[in-house]
Curated annotation (Swiss-Prot):
GO cellular component, one term: extracellular region
Reaction(s) catalysed (UniProt annotation): cutin + H2O = cutin monomers
SMART domains linked to this entry: Cutinase
Quaternary context: Interacts with hadrophobin rolA in a pH-dependent manner.
GO molecular function annotations of the record: cutinase activity
The protein, known as: Cutinase 1
Species of the source: Aspergillus oryzae (strain ATCC 42149 / RIB 40)
Protein encoded by which gene: cutL1
Protein family membership: Belongs to the cutinase family.
pH dependence: Optimum pH is 9.0.
Site (Transition state stabilizer): S48, Q127
Effect of D142S: Reduces the affinity for hydrophobin rolA
Temperature dependence comment: Optimum temperature is 25-40 degrees Celsius. Optimum temperature is 35-55 degrees Celsius.
Length: 213
């Protein structure tokens, strides 16, 4: 599929997303950079075209659930602004830009250096899953060890990475790929199931909480 056709297909389905924008909560998501250290740090990369740092769907949903379960203990940090969540970057060799990967890698390293006692959990949605894969596999073993769990919604590198993150323990990762979500099969064809992951955010949050010490 040519890049122009990829962009048109992704843009059309983004507009046609069945999730009502009025029901979504847009949060700041810059709490690692701007706030005090917390016992838990959640780092998330949003889907293509989503505004803000956490986005307006699965990112805020997981963040809010973690905060409800561990009141006062969670800092939520979205990847940006160098990660722009633009559509064309989906067609790059790693499914996102090198700038986005480097920014996410830097956030993980910042969490460890700034807050050495924090437990890190992470996630991504759509293009954001490629950001997480690219960043986490490049981290040192010491930083990777601080990451307790990762959830990936509509994993765009699922087929290429065989359902896991390269160079990272498989038991720390939970992948959510809906039936009929063709990006999980290694394509850039975005079908309606790709927008179904809000219903998985409760289970994903429970998984991350279960990974904490």
């Amino acid at each position: 599929m040519h890049l122009r056709n990829i962009v048109i297909a992704l843009a059309a389905t983004a507009v046609a997303s069945p999730v009502d924008l009025q029901d979504r909560q847009l949060t700041g998501g810059d709490e690692l950079r701007d706030g005090p250290c917390k016992p838990i740090t959640f780092i998330f990369a949003r889907a293509s075209t989503e505004p803000g740092l956490l986005g307006i769907s699965t990112g805020p949903a997981v963040c809010n659930r973690l905060k409800l379960a561990r009141s006062g203990d969670v800092a939520c940090q979205g990847v940006g602004p160098r990660y722009t969540a633009d559509l064309p970057s989906n067609a790059l060799p790693e499914g996102t830009s090198q700038a986005a990967i480097a920014e996410a890698q830097g956030l993980f390293e910042q969490a460890v250096s700034k807050c050495p006692d924090t437990q890190i959990v992470a996630g991504g949605y759509s293009q954001g899953t490629a950001v997480m894969n690219g960043a986490i596999k490049r981290l040192s073993a010491d930083v990777q060890d601080k990451i307790k769990g990762v959830v990936l919604f509509g994993y765009t590198r699922n087929a290429q990475e065989r359902g896991q993150i390269a160079n990272f323990p498989k038991d720390k990762v939970k992948v959510y790929c809906a039936v009929g979500d063709l990006v999980c099969l290694g394509t850039l064809i975005v079908a309606p199931p790709h927008f179904s992951y809000l219903s998985d955010t409760g289970d994903a949050s429970d998984f991350l909480l279960s990974q904490l010490g």
